[in-house]
Amino acid sequence: MAPPVPGAVSGGSGEVDELFDVKNAFYIGSYQQCINEAQRVKLSSPEREVERDVFLYRAYLAQRKYGVVLDEIKPSSAPELQAVRMFAEYLASENQRDSIVLELDREMSRSVDVTNTTFLLMAASIYFHDQNPDAALRTLHQGDGLECMAMTIQILLKLDRLDLARKELKKMQDQDEDATLTQLATAWVNLAVGGEKLQEAYYIFQELADKCSPTLLLLNGQAACHSAQGRWETAEGVLQEALDKDSGHPETLINLIVLSQHLGKPPEVTNRYLSQLKDAHRAHPFIKEYQAKENDFDRLAMQYAPSA
């Protein structure tokens, strides 16, 4: 039986969240819908308007439209928006990343406003992109919102700490079991657990796709469930659907590279996906690691090359 899809209430209080559609679209990876909803919604207070703008600009970041964020968020903007701008600067300026991280380190060493959840999320995102998951986790542990917990779970799963991820998920479920983020985090953990939990994870991704929209995030989640169950051809069909939506989406291309190997596709098929990934995301960690492995192989091959 599929899990329930969350309703538009916040924190189990029964209070309707004016920004539910904006947040929900962002969480499932429907970034253009998030932007459209944010521009349409009428809000009851300036605080809610800042919160709306945070999700609006984060959606632009997810679309790699860094210039929009850098142009529109001014020095006089709210602290939450300044945090989004900081992440935009990091993503947009590869040659300035070290100095941005140093400045962030200085800021973190001072007294941080832990009620500014957006700052904690953006700081953790910078640390994680900078290959410093420990600093990202330390930052997130200062917050107690669902987004901080969900990001903590993502990082713990990447570190193969399923035990800690399950504990964090329990905290999310205690806070709001039916929230979209809790449902997604449950699917991620179930995917890592494997076995009979794979079908439960698939149901969550499928239910959210049916109810909301079959986004790239949800389609890749479904494909991961199929792959983990050995249903490679079914996974390929789902990933092709994702590729039709965005031919340069990194997770889709990486999953297709792995899938092609399992299906015994000709080398040129795998190389084509790899070339697409390089064209769209030359600095992606997968590409960097792949090229490092290629260089290692070339060095080893040279050692065993016959001497003239």
UniProtKB/Swiss-Prot annotation:
UniProt-annotated location(s): Cytoplasm; Golgi apparatus membrane; Cytoplasmic vesicle, COPI-coated vesicle membrane
Membrane topology note: Peripheral membrane protein
Keyword Phosphoprotein: yes
SUPFAM superfamilies: TPR-like
Any one GO MF annotation of this record: structural molecule activity
GO biological-process terms attached to the record: protein localization to axon; protein transport; retrograde vesicle-mediated transport, Golgi to endoplasmic reticulum
Gene3D superfamilies tied to this protein: Tetratricopeptide repeat domain
Record-listed Phosphoserine modification sites: 13, 45, 99
Subunit structure: Oligomeric complex that consists of at least the alpha, beta, beta', gamma, delta, epsilon and zeta subunits.
UniProt family annotation: Belongs to the COPE family.
Function: The coatomer is a cytosolic protein complex that binds to dilysine motifs and reversibly associates with Golgi non-clathrin-coated vesicles, which further mediate biosynthetic protein transport from the ER, via the Golgi up to the trans Golgi network. The coatomer complex is required for budding from Golgi membranes, and is essential for the retrograde Golgi-to-ER transport of dilysine-tagged proteins.
Descriptive protein name: Coatomer subunit epsilon
Protein source organism: Mus musculus (Mouse)
Gene: Cope
